[in-house]
Amino acid sequence: MPRRREVPKRDVLPDPKFGNVEVAKFMNVLMLDGKKSVAERIVYGAFDQIEKKAGKAPIEVFSVAINNVKPVVEVKSRRVGGANYQVPVEVRPSRRLALAMRWLREAAKKRSEKSMALRLAGELLEAAEGRGGAMKKRDEVHRMAEANKAFSHFRF
């Protein structure tokens, strides 16, 4: 790979229905094999379910869920004198969002509801309330960082 210059990040266009950039990014995370229309159908279907079940604005539920799942710290492996240490580091804001979206997707995939839209709706509602698989993953990452606090002086 050439090392001439850093390639600029492309801006994601907001989604057509809600005009929200985070929703568009989430669709891109959800998309498989470039099938954006399928990802859109899943997300909008999940939002319809959220409106039916909770009676709240789906965009608000989505943003609360994302903010709840965002990790503050994570651990990175660092080799020092023949031993690997799990060093807690703060997570960059862009990575926080990416991890939260990825964890929500994976937690929704593991659920038992019939369609992906129903699974995603259930996971988003639970994450907004501070429960669910994605929240469990975030808490696990935070616990790992807390347990390895002693190695935080091995900064990167």
UniProtKB/Swiss-Prot annotation:
GO terms for biological process: translation. The keyword RNA-binding applies. InterPro entries: Ribosomal_uS7, Ribosomal_uS7_bac/org-type, Ribosomal_uS7_CS, Ribosomal_uS7_dom, Ribosomal_uS7_dom_sf. One of its GO terms (molecular function) is rRNA binding. PROSITE patterns: RIBOSOMAL_S7. Coiled coil: none annotated. Pfam families: Ribosomal_S7 (PF00177). It comes from the Bacteria. GO terms for cellular component: small ribosomal subunit. Keywords: Ribonucleoprotein, Ribosomal protein, RNA-binding, rRNA-binding, tRNA-binding. The keyword Metal-binding does not apply. PANTHER family: RIBOSOMAL PROTEIN S7. One of the primary rRNA binding proteins, it binds directly to 16S rRNA where it nucleates assembly of the head domain of the 30S subunit. Is located at the subunit interface close to the decoding center, probably blocks exit of the E-site tRNA. NCBIfam families: rpsG_bact (TIGR01029). Part of the 30S ribosomal subunit. Contacts proteins S9 and S11. Belongs to the universal ribosomal protein uS7 family. This is Small ribosomal subunit protein uS7. It comes from Cupriavidus taiwanensis (strain DSM 17343 / BCRC 17206 / CCUG 44338 / CIP 107171 / LMG 19424 / R1) (Ralstonia taiwanensis (strain LMG 19424)).
